[in-house]
Design a protein with these regions (language model features):
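Short beta-strand elements that form the blades of beta-propeller/WD-repeat-like
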Residues: 13, 83-105, 136-169, 196-211, ...
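Non-catalytic localization/regulatory regions flanking kinase domains
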Residues: 12-17, 24-29, 34, 43-47, ...
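Short, surface-exposed coil-to-beta transition loops
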Residues: 32-38, 257, 279
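Active-site-adjacent structural elements in enzyme catalytic domains
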Residues: 40-45, 153
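Surface-exposed loop/turn elements that mediate protein-protein interactions on large endomembrane-trafficking
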Residues: 48-76, 101-128, 159-190, 210-230, ...
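Repeated scaffold domains used in trafficking and secretory/extracellular systems
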Residues: 79-86, 124-141, 186-200, 231-242, ...
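A short, structured loop/turn motif at beta-sheet edges
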Residues: 5-13, 43-46, 285-289
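Surface-exposed, charged secondary-structure patches
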Residues: 2-29, 134-142
Length: 304
């Protein structure tokens, strides 16, 4: 059991206990589950009082008996219905993330492959199972190869004990993962999830990533780092659904900008939208690859 203090405020504390359990299934074997229990406790002169209790339970995918007769992947019990998954254009290779591990399912061979995981096959998983990282599926090619991003605490491997961002490429034919870039970060995981990687994209040998309101590009061959955009404040920019384009206020002002610049990261091209002299523009979002923006007369804007 791994205890963790989530927060402490005066006489109230929130604690989390994380552990694993096993349970028999219908196939004469057992399944493994990760359990997180949250306790909200108050301390008084007379003792401790439990104010609230919550429990989450998630099944650990192991690729055994997890493919149904209708070719659906059975992920079992999960506390969320959201699944981090993506497929190639032909729908042959499906990548998905489960409990900190990246898996690939090939519909042509009807096989599962564990692409990336900190967990070992024959360990107690205490060190490897520390859950403080995210996996983002970046790109899947028609031959099954994939590019993905691991951000957070590195449980094992070359960067064990460090917090950072690792850009990796997986070769399906060779069943091999190659790290193309590692960016160490001197911040804890909970801060990293808020300030790093909100925008990330790979185009050929160029990698884009947003860190602390600045969009950087990295040449994956020469490792040269370039600053593309600065001052990307919340609500001052929008990213396309595919993640390959970003539209942002050139001035960085949410309610007073006369120019919006749209950067297409897939081909490194850009164009600008200009407002009339007495008007202002604001990026609102994307519908697929179509950029949506708002326009208003400056004299009609009243800031409270």
């Amino acid at each position: 059991i791994m205890p963790e203090v989530i927060s402490v405020d005066d006489d109230v504390a929130i604690l989390r206990l994380s552990y694993r359990v096993g349970a028999a299934n219908d196939y004469s074997s057992s399944d493994t589950y990760t359990v997180s229990e949250y306790y909200r406790i108050r301390q008084t002169n007379s003792g401790f009082y439990l104010l609230n209790f919550e429990r989450e339970m998630n099944q650990v995918f192991d690729a055994r008996n997890d493919l149904t007769s209708t070719a659906k992947i059975n992920l079992g019990i999960n506390s969320s219905t959201d699944v981090n998954c993506a497929s190639d254009e032909k729908g042959i290779y499906t990548y998905f993330v489960n409990q900190g591990s990246l898996w690939c399912f090939s519909s042509s061979s009807q096989t599962f492959t564990r692409v990336f995981s900190f967990k070992g096959e024959e360990t107690d998983s205490v060190r490897e199972g520390y859950d403080a990282h995210n996996i983002k599926i970046m790109k899947i090619e028609d031959n099954g190869d994939a590019t993905f991003l691991v951000s957070g605490y590195m449980n094992r491997g070359e960067h064990e004990g460090q917090v950072g961002v690792s850009l990796c490429r997986y070769s399906y034919s060779d069943n091999d993962v190659t790290e193309r870039l590692f960016i160490p970060m001197a911040i804890p995981y909970n801060i990293l999830t808020q300030n790093v990687g909100g925008v990330s994209y790979v185009s050929n040998d160029k990698f884009y990533i947003l860190i602390d309101e600045t969009l950087y590009s990295v040449d994956l061959v020469s490792k040269e780092v370039m600053t593309e955009i600065t001052g990307l404040k919340e609500n001052s920019y929008a990213v396309s659904d595919a993640g390959d384009a970003i539209a942002y206020s050139v001035s960085g002002d949410i309610c007073n900008t006369d120019t919006i610049r749209v950067l297409n990261m897939s081909n490194d091209s850009a164009y600008e939208l200009k407002a009339d002299e007495a008007d202002t523009l604001r990026p609102l979002g994307y519908i697929d690859s179509d950029f949506i923006y708002g326009m208003a007369h400056k004299e009609d804007i009243c800031l409270l």
